[in-house]
Regions:
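Surface-exposed coil loops of outer-membrane beta-barrel proteins
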Residues: 36-37, 102-167
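Residues that define the transmembrane beta-barrel architecture of outer-membrane proteins
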Residues: 43-53, 84-90, 130-134, 164-166
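Outer-membrane beta-barrel channels and translocator barrels
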Residues: 60-64, 97-101, 143-145
Length: 167
């Protein structure tokens, strides 16, 4: 947490020194899914009820470039295992924006993707609880609204216990 605060302080100091645009903001989301059912052998009964807050700050330069630092704060309601928050994750990413193209690299929210995938591929609970992409994404959007998008999510670093995993 101290490292994130230091990075944010340096980012804001550098932005002020070079007279670039500094911004702050936050994203907020909640999730409720009551999966209480009886006599089902496929899945256990349970209820998902959570909230997520992601305060962010960053620098914009040349109108098309952004460097963003955020903290993703997740709280599962009724969670007795954690004293304060259920999960805290960093988001640090570079974003390029133009009228027809966007590119993002780093650790960034899944909400920056244009495509909304069917729950068959990415379940709604999976998308909420795994809302960050660690990798890169790019898309091109035509004037008619059609688009092509590429995203690479590096979910697992190779170690003695795990294999590399990309999605």
């Amino acid at each position: 947490m101290k490292q994130i605060a230091l990075i944010l302080t340096l980012l804001l100091a550098a932005a002020g020194a070079s007279a670039q645009e500094v911004f702050i903001g936050a994203d907020f989301d909640t999730w409720f899914d009551n999966r209480e059912h009886s006599d089902c052998n496929i899945d256990d009964s349970h209820t998902f009820f959570s909230m997520r807050l992601a305060p962010k700050a960053g620098v914009i330069w040349s109108e098309k470039n952004q460097l963003v630092v955020a903290v993703d704060l997740l709280q599962d309601f009724g969670d007795k295992e954690h004293k304060f928050l259920s999960k805290v994750d960093p988001q640090i990413y570079y974003q390029f924006n133009s009228k027809t193209a966007q590119a993002v690299a780093g650790i960034f929210p899944r909400s920056l993707l244009l495509a909304r995938y069917d729950p068959f591929f990415l379940g709604s609970a999976y998308s909420f609880y795994n809302n960050r992409i660690q990798g890169l994404a790019a898309h091109y959007k035509s004037q008619t609204g059609s688009f092509i998008e590429f995203a690479l999510d590096w979910e697992g670093m190779r170690s003695y216990q795990t294999r590399e995993k990309f999605r």
